[in-house]
Amino acid sequence: MRVLLALLLSAGPALAEPAIPRFVEEPGPDSTYAGGWEYMVGGGAASFDCDADGFADLLLAGGEAPARFLRNRSAQGGPLDFAAEPSGLELTAVTGAYPLDVDSDGVMDLALLRVGETVLMRGLGGCRFARANEDWGFDGGDAWTTAFAATWEVGADWPTLALGTYIDRTQEDFPWGSCTENRLYRPAGKGFAAPLPLTPSYCALSMLFTDWNRSGQPALRVSNDREYYKGGQEQLWHLAPGETPRLYTEAEGWARLRIWGMGIASQDLTGDGYPEYFLTSMADNKLQSLAATDAPLLPRYDDIAFARGATAHRPPEGGDLRPSTAWHPEFADVNNDGLSDLFIAKGNVSEMPDFAMEDPNNLLLQRPDGSFREAAAEAGVASLVTARGAALADFNMDGLLDLVVVNRNAPAQLWRNAGGATGHWIGVRPRQPGPNPDAVGGWLELRQGERIARREITVGGGHAGARLAGCTWGSAPGRKRSCG
């Protein structure tokens, strides 16, 4: 599936080194991801437009505190202005949230991940929401839920959902080896069938449906926390319509990988048409690229993080040289030069002495040769507060991506992208008639001269949250472009 849009732009000369955007911290939302050990993970941010004004609104996980909905009242090109309003989303025990138009009625719904029952919230319009588990036949369980992904399988009117869970919270004294069952929910009529187990389950902290081989058939990537599993690894699930999910095996090319898997971000960085995957961990971040793209295509990946300057394994600033702890990763073009950059939210789990306590966020700007340059401090987003989830979105509709970061046991932070030496941009909101109006699972392509940049439209990944709204593409200078 491709979403089609064509346009031509022009700009000035290209630069060998990426332009540094200037982020201005603005009064942050009155929201804190609060709590004890059950909230050491999670803390997601969901960005979506729930009142059809084109401006992205926010829901921030609150942990033991109620989740906080923030309506976007910003003026175009002006300071960022969010107001907390009652929405029906103010549940406690929320670890994360993902936007999705579940029933394809044109009004955004949300999945609220919780320590306890996961709740699907139906959008009523005007940024009001109501519980829909019973109406949609959705069994939200009672687990410590930390990961979510959604897609539309071929021919389906309703989405397929995946829930990833963490450890058995009744085993606080000895949680190792207590990973609970992940679940797959397929549609049945105007709702969902009983969930299918995705076992073995290894304490998932991020999930992503992705068409890794461009076959038109999504698979499910699962990133798992090695701290608590026994005999586990990263996972990739076959998801053939009507068939029981099954894991890719070593015989099919899948190599065993064990990391403290926290988050997933995907983007075609090499221009070969296939997505690369950035996996966050504790000092062991990976940037995976297909080892070979000739037939038969196998899910065998090389780690290109070191070669690309994207290991982000220790703090780039300050005197704390202990390893970093990475959470939410997100690819986006923050300086509008036509190249995907990478933001990584950082923060110690909970006073772990072997890892950095002063652990600033990363902002890796991509160079024209495909390597990355650290720029968080210069750009103004190298906060030392303990971060978890985040979202990059154009909150004031000026063509520049702004940033919100959810912090653990500290207030969330908000930055406005004030530009600097930035290029032109293209704003795109994919829409299609019928089921799946946001074209989840589709691909956007931006042609710039002989180069084609590709972006898969996904719901999932990151760490405990994601955005689903219009997207902004930077426009590389000096060439004709088309987006389709």
What is each PLM-predicted segment?
Residues 163-180, 223-231, 344-358:
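Short, conserved, GDST-rich strand-edge loop motifs in beta-rich repeat architectures
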Residues 19-37, 83-92, 132-144, 194-203, ...:
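Short loop/turn motifs that recur once per blade in beta-propeller domains
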Residues 42-52, 71, 94-104, 108, ...:
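Beta-propeller blade termini
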Residues 94-96, 115-153, 168-175, 179-181, ...:
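Asp-box/WD-like beta-propeller blade repeats and closely related beta-sheet repeat scaffolds
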